[in-house]
Amino acid sequence: ACYALITDLKRLGMLDDTLVVWGGEFGRTNYCQGKLTRENYGRDHHPRAFTTWMAGGGVKPGITYGQSDDFGYNLTDRDGNVIKPNMDHWTKDTMHVHDLNATILHLLGIDHRKLTYRYQGRDFRLTDIHGHVIKDIIT
């Protein structure tokens, strides 16, 4: 279905103006917690590594951005060294969910820093104060 959608959008000349995003807010662990049974297959939420793909709408086609270790457990740099996400320091070639949201909003023409709402006396943003637009994936 995804292939058909993208093929049709491209054929109709609509892909450049349409951003297709497929993903979730977290990955899944690659191991079991507890005994493996039919009722308990043990794959838990895993926010350290997740997969999202995007097409059209200003995204460079055919690239991969970021990577995990061989187990899909931790983020790694291009040399395979584990990266511990640091909200105070952005690391090139990694993408936090705040960066993903900032990039999607940018592709939609929205400045993520201006998308702010006040709740209980505090200003909040979807991208928190840490989001960066990842220009390496934008055409």
Where are the regions that the model predicts?
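Ligand-binding pockets and gating/stacking loops
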Residues: A1-T139
